[in-house]
């Protein structure tokens, strides 16, 4: 009787241990896959300058904006503002006047990343982090994007202001043309071990 009881107890314990081990292995595998996907997305990001005329779905636009707002922010002030521009006249006008944003003529939309100077004096740092998040989200969603600067060039800032109606305290950091890439494009391998220094330069 007791032998049967102990035998059953051993079997139950073995099952519990095996199940726990399998669950831990599964969690480890999921963590590995997640980290691999994140790192691959970072390394595969590229600046896209040629686009299809295909429109971008609203849920993807929302996903990019959420990614932007998930960026780190000094003292959690979150000084960013985002203007989603789909107006054809505005896109073409900015394309004509911004020297490195000519591709705006072929994209369905652009996101203008701006900073509120009344919330933070280092808004441009927080907004740069938000911009990178948007670029990475675009890559993950199968979209193309490129960072085109407005700040700190006063003439470019004025162009963006004229086309987006920004108040004086809101400064555009950059204009991000976004759309579906026109054909495959390969990311550059930018890693350079000569730029890495340990403890001292």
List the model feature ranges, each with a label.
Residues 1-201:
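Acidic, surface-exposed loops and disordered segments
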């Amino acid at each position: 009787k007791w032998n049967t009881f102990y035998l059953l107890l051993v079997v139950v314990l073995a099952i519990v241990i095996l199940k726990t081990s399998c669950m831990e292995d599964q969690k480890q595998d999921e963590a590995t896959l997640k980290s691999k996907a994140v790192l691959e997305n970072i390394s595969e990001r590229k600046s896209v300058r040629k686009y299809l005329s295909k429109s971008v779905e609203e849920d993807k636009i929302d996903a990019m904006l959420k990614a932007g707002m998930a960026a780190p922010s000094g003292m959690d002030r979150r000084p960013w503002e985002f203007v989603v521009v789909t107006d054809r006249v505005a896109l073409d006008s900015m394309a004509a006047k911004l020297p490195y944003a000519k591709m705006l003529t072929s994209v369905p939309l652009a996101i203008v990343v701006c900073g509120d100077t009344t919330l933070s004096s280092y808004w441009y740092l927080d907004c740069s982090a938000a911009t990178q998040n948007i670029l990475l989200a675009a890559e993950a969603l199968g979209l193309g994007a490129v960072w085109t600067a407005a700040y700190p060039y006063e003439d470019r800032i004025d162009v963006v202001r004229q086309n987006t109606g920004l108040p004086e305290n809101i400064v555009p950091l950059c204009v991000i043309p976004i759309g579906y890439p026109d054909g495959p494009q390969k990311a550059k391998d930018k890693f350079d071990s000569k730029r890495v220094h340990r403890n001292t330069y």
